[in-house]
Amino acid sequence: MACSLQKLFAVEEEFEDEDFLSAVEDAENRFTGSLPVNAGRLRPVSSRPQETVQAQSSRLLLLHPTAPSEALGLPDLDLCLPASSTPSADSRPSCIGAAPLRPVSTSSSWIGNQRRVTVTEVLRETARPQSSALHPLLTFESQQQQVGGFEGPEQDEFDKVLASMELEEPGMELECGVSSEAIPILPAQQREGSVLAKKARVVDLSGSCQKGPVPAIHKAGIMSAQDESLDPVIQCRTPRPPLRPGAVGHLPVPTALTVPTQQLHWEVCPQRSPVQALQPLQAARGTIQSSPQNRFPCQPFQSPSSWLSGKAHLPRPRTPNSSCSTPSRTSSGLFPRIPLQPQAPVSSIGSPVGTPKGPQGALQTPIVTNHLVQLVTAASRTPQQPTHPSTRAKTRRFPGPAGILPHQQSGRSLEDIMVSAPQTPTHGALAKFQTEIVASSQASVEEDFGRGPWLTMKSTLGLDERDPSCFLCTYSIVMVLRKQAALKQLPRNKVPNMAVMIKSLTRSTMDASVVFKDPTGEMQGTVHRLLLETCQNELKPGSVLLLKQIGVFSPSLRNHYLNVTPNNLVHIYSPDSGDGSFLKPSQPFPKDSGSFQHDVAAKPEEGFRTAQNLEAEASPEEELPEADDLDGLLSELPEDFFCGTSS
């Protein structure tokens, strides 16, 4: 039988349930004889070293149902949770005493001799008559170091209370029983190098445990084998304690109170690999509470790390839907799992808030997903800053969409832009004046003010532009714009005396738009229509106007215009005439013109005499060649008519 089982467990791949059950039945038929044949059951025993102080150790046993459960015809598989031995006063062969429930785990470091129990010896001891309800058991005992002496009666009893765990599907229940007595441990044997004995195991699940004893209100139910069959119910505060036997699958536990167990996953590992036992699952605050029939005291659960230290540890809680798993990777690789099907409902286990996570879970290779690949790829890439937004940010002069507008092609700023000339009539009658503007604007400043009418005006009046007291300096175009725009120093917005040259003249239906200039700058203005009619031939580009009391019109802070009327005009120096043409004697110069009055008095008498002679010789009947009948009629009108109209 041992050889057949070794061959069965020696395979490194997963085998079917029928193969395992057939081997077990064959073994039972050989060794049991007249005993009734039933499905073989595994009794994995913990391989964790026990405390030296404690005299007895509990095992993870696979028990058979009692007589009442057999009457129902339900064979079951009982998983006895290993627990520390109770005091000698409480342990009795006939009745089962209270025993503390301890999570059994396998230490990663193995010391001392390793023990192995053969199937023949186990069957020989389990075949002793104890009760008519007991069945033969198959016990596979894991490797263990014997720290303290183990004592126990020869007769096999139920080791301890069955601590059951509910499974997810209906009819699935995990029975866990704890007995106060343990079977004697067989002598240790050396490992065989060529043959690897496969042993059923349940991997330790206690990854991180919390210290502290379990409250006494939670106790395990006790089940008597000889006298009566109690219904122990292990109640926990949380509904789902899942088991995770390896990476191949997990066993979630639903919230049902008592359901029969249908499937239990076992993992078979080689003899050289560490064997781990089933550990009761509970959270930091969740404990096990016994049924009303149970009156035995309960000791707190202890984690494998605290067995030698004597301190209790509880697993860390997790989410209720999470499943506890046993790692499937050891030094030998993956282990095949054998599903068994016990069917005896005895008790149920409710899990605390969550279940602990196995300590070996962190050693598993992380699952590579598309999201993980994208994160790694994005982290490895060097960030590239966009060039287009940065370029736009540099060109934006102020917030808003208008800040992206390009600069003007001419390079002129808003401060330099002045009010444009009035629009030209659409009929195009004044196109010839536009031609004059282009022709006159081509002359340079030196040619305009170094000779011609401007030089004639200065020589006639004896003016010097470099004299600070001269009106050519104090009331130049630049000074007028500065005083008017910035300083507001012009009295009644009028300039006392001023001399300007016509740069361009654009006639309209009413007035004419003129651009005046002098050596300091340019300025826009208007010429009254009466003055245009009177001095039509003299008012042309290049003529120099001598003005007095000129009004300055300022529609805005940046735009200023000179308004030239017949009352403001003193003399016109035409580019065609040498000395220039003066006004008629009926329009005398004002006496309060300041320096301009002294300049006019200093002029030679020949100039006035020449002007008077020209007027005396001219008669109303004598007309100039260019004059027509309309000009003759206008010349016959009295002067008061023009003065009244202009005013």
UniProtKB/Swiss-Prot annotation:
InterPro entries: HROB (IPR028045). Residues 287-308, 380-390 have a biased composition (Polar residues). One of its GO terms (biological process) is female gamete generation. It is found in: Nucleus; Chromosome. The keyword Transport does not apply. GO terms for molecular function: single-stranded DNA binding. The keyword DNA repair applies. The modification Asymmetric dimethylarginine is found at residues 285, 295, 329, 337. The modification Phosphoserine is found at residue 47. Keywords: Chromosome, Disease variant, DNA damage, DNA recombination, DNA repair, DNA synthesis, DNA-binding, Methylation, Nucleus, Phosphoprotein. It comes from the Eukaryota. Residues 284-361, 380-399, 581-631 are annotated as: Disordered. Residues 618-631 have a biased composition (Acidic residues). One of its GO terms (cellular component) is site of DNA damage. Residues 319-332 have a biased composition (Low complexity). It is linked to Ovarian dysgenesis 11: An autosomal recessive form of ovarian dysgenesis, a disorder characterized by lack of spontaneous pubertal development, primary amenorrhea, uterine hypoplasia, and hypergonadotropic hypogonadism as a result of streak gonads. Interacts with MCM8; this interaction is necessary for MCM8-MCM9 helicase complex recruitment to DNA damage sites. Interacts with RPA1; this interaction associates HROB with the RPA complex. DNA-binding protein involved in homologous recombination that acts by recruiting the MCM8-MCM9 helicase complex to sites of DNA damage to promote DNA repair synthesis. This is Homologous recombination OB-fold protein.
